Amino acid sequence: MSGWDDYIKLLFGKSPAIKRAAIIGSDGSVWARSGDANAFRATEVELKRFAALFNDINSVPGTGADLEEIHYIVPRVEEKLIFGKKEQTGFFAAKTNQAIVIAMYEGDNAQSASVRAGVEYIAQYLASSGY
């Protein structure tokens, strides 16, 4: 792939439920984000705080997570994965050594499975490429 934006396009192709997406560095810096009507709207401050959640991932279900000025409950975390939910919206975020892949989605639990699969696919690809 030629650029970070290509990974965002590929992620959107993995699930129609994905509405916005970003790839950020482990420091919260933005590497790529969806734009236009699907603009990923998280602020720089939110992204720095969000990236730091992976430093103590097991505490995240107790506190939740904030993205795009929305507070999400976090019913589940895994070693390098955070799942956030609020009503019929949510996100999946997967961390690699240097990056965090985030996809915001709308839909029910059945649709969330394809979102998770897409996020994990991109994260695994980045990890295998040294990121």
Swiss-Prot record:
**Broad class of where this protein is predominantly found:** cytoplasm
Q: Which GO terms describe its cellular component?
A: cell cortex; cytoskeleton
Q: From the UniProt record, give one GO term of the biological process aspect.
A: muscle thin filament assembly
InterPro entries the record matches: PFN (IPR048278), PFN_euk (IPR005455), PFN_sf (IPR036140)
Q: Where is this gene product found?
A: Cytoplasm, Cytoskeleton
User: Keyword set for this entry?
Assistant: Actin-binding, Cytoplasm, Cytoskeleton
Instruction: Tell me the GO molecular function terms.
Output: actin monomer binding
Name the Gene3D superfamilies on file.
Dynein light chain 2a, cytoplasmic (3.30.450.30)
Which tissues is this protein detected in according to the database?
Answer: Expressed in the intestinal wall, the spermatheca, and the pharynx.
Under the heading CDD domains, the entry gives: PROF
- The domain of life is Eukaryota
What does this protein do, in the record's words?
Binds to actin and affects the structure of the cytoskeleton. At high concentrations, profilin prevents the polymerization of actin, whereas it enhances it at low concentrations. By binding to PIP2, it inhibits the formation of IP3 and DG.
Regarding protein family, the annotation reads: Belongs to the profilin family.
Q: How does it assemble?
A: Occurs in many kinds of cells as a complex with monomeric actin in a 1:1 ratio.
Q: What is this protein called?
A: Profilin-2
Q: Which organism is it from?
A: Caenorhabditis elegans
Taxonomic lineage:
Eukaryota, Metazoa, Ecdysozoa, Nematoda, Chromadorea
